[in-house]
Curated annotation (Swiss-Prot):
Residues 238-248, 416-427, 437-446 have a biased composition (Basic residues). InterPro entries: G_patch_dom, PINX1. It comes from the Eukaryota. It comes from Homo sapiens (Human). Residues 11-57 form the G-patch domain. This is G patch domain-containing protein 4. Residues 219-237, 249-268, 297-328, 363-375, 392-409 have a biased composition (Basic and acidic residues).
């Protein structure tokens, strides 16, 4: 038969190695006399419903009849006498111990006396017990310090005193403190000098007391004055309320200023470049608005002059209209040139502003956002300028065609010239209406 070797766990191997180091060999028991266990304890899993310590094989190993026979045989005693052999069984009473049951009457209460018609009869047992207790419970003697020193042969807990180092000064100081304390309790002045053990009250408490006293004094004075003059009392109440409000507002403003100052210090370096650009943009916008207003005024004045010329006399008006038409024909060219120059200047200013932001600005994200907004605005403005220029170009072309037709027909007949002169102010009025519409659109966009 092949015996399978035992599979040892890591813990068992480690324990065997430690025991082998100390001279243990397999088969020996543990302990100094080597009479201990020879095999290691092993943990077994409990996979049944029986209690701890239950032996399921006890039914087959327990021979109860054998035990019963042995017990009865042990109780039998065989005695041999003159009469013969006698068998006697031991009584059960001898094997038991007599334990008297406690009296459950008056378990937690003590019977002091019994009531009768004649009176109370005290319990004698209790009296005897109380006498014994009084005799036995004598108060022990209280030893004095001198008696303790004699009993301990002059030895104390202070070991240095054995060498002659005593604490006479400290003991004297403690005695003086005790005497002063006792005198203070009795209300007498101590004869011995007191140590300055009590700490002086702090100055803060004194200040608070003074402030409270002053406030109470002022309050009492106000009450007296209020009783005498109730009108002044109402005024004082209003003033005090106003002062409180101002004080609270001042606190709130100080807190806000503190927070804003901290934020301003942090953002000062980054917003310096942006502030300069904003100021420049504002100045540029104001200049542009002024220039636009001047242009519109000039155009309205010129259109009004043309209308007045058409309404005047026909003979003198023919010469004036030709002069005005020649001027108006020259004006669009000059206007275009001026607008182109202004747009170029605006673009140059915007390019410079963007360069300064990119060069000196500390916060790139903010500068980019600002530049994007400006580029959008500039694009919108350019589109508006282009639309206005297109409108003016159309007008100028119409005016130019009308002028050529008028110049050709002026030599032919005066009637044709009159009709054209009557039609010309209508066209001018239509141009004025378109200009006004463009103005309204710009205002709505702004």
């Amino acid at each position: 038969m092949n015996v399978t070797p035992e599979v040892k766990s890591r813990g068992m191997k480690f324990a065997e190695e430690q025991l082998l180091k100390h001279g243990w060999t397999q088969g020996k028991g543990l302990g100094r006399k080597e009479n201990g266990i020879t095999q290691a304890l092993r943990v077994t899993l409990k996979q049944d419903t029986h209690g701890v310590g239950h032996d399921p094989a006890k039914e087959f190993t327990n021979h109860w009849w054998n035990e019963l026979f042995n017990k009865t045989a042990a109780n039998l005693v065989v005695e041999t006498g003159q009469d013969g052999v006698q068998i006697r069984s031991l009584s059960k009473e001898t094997t038991r111990y007599n334990h008297p049951k406690p009296n459950l009457l008056y378990q937690k209460f003590v019977k002091m006396a019994t009531l009768t018609s004649g009176g109370e009869k005290p319990n004698k047992d209790l009296e005897s017990c109380s006498d014994d207790d009084n005799q036995g419970s004598k108060s022990p003697k209280i030893l004095t310090d001198e008696m303790l020193l004699q009993a301990c042969e002059g030895r104390t807990a202070h070991k240095a005193a054995r060498l002659g180092i005593t604490m006479k000064a400290k003991l004297a100081r403690l005695e003086a403190q005790e005497q002063a304390f006792l005198a203070r309790l009795k209300g007498q002045d101590p004869g011995a000098p007191q140590l300055q053990s009590e700490s002086k009250p702090p100055k803060k408490k004194k200040k608070k007391r003074r402030q409270k006293e002053e406030e109470e004094a002022t309050a009492s004075e106000r009450n007296d004055a209020d009783e005498k003059h109730p009108e002044h009392a109402e005024q004082n109440i209003r003033k005090s309320k106003k002062k409180k409000r101002r004080h609270q507002e001042g606190k709130v403003s100080d807190e806000r200023e503190g927070t804003t100052k901290g934020n301003e210090k942090e953002d000062a370096a980054g917003t310096s470049g942006l502030g300069e650009l904003n100021s420049r943009e504002q100045t540029n916008q104001s200049l542009r608005k002024g220039k636009k207003k001047k242009r519109w005024h000039h155009e309205e004045e010129k259109m009004g002059v043309l209308e007045e010329g058409g309404k005047g006399k026909e003979a003198a008006g023919s010469v004036r209209t030709e002069e005005v038409e020649s001027r108006a024909y020259a004006d669009p060219c000059s206007r275009r040139k001026k607008r182109q120059q202004q747009e170029e200047e605006d673009l140059n200013l915007e390019d410079r502003g963007e360069e300064t932001v990119l060069g000196g600005g500390t916060r790139e994200a903010e500068s980019r956002a600002c530049s994007d907004g400006r580029s959008r605005k500039s694009k919108k403005k350019r589109q508006q300028h282009q639309e206005e220029e297109d409108i003016l170009d159309v007008r100028d072309e119409k005016d130019g065609g009308a002028r050529e037709a008028e110049s050709r027909a002026h030599t032919g007949s005066s009637s044709r010239g009159k009709r054209k002169r009557q039609q010309h102010p209508k066209k001018e009025r239509a141009g004025v209406s378109t200009v006004q519409k463009a103005k309204k659109k710009q205002k709505k966009r702004d």
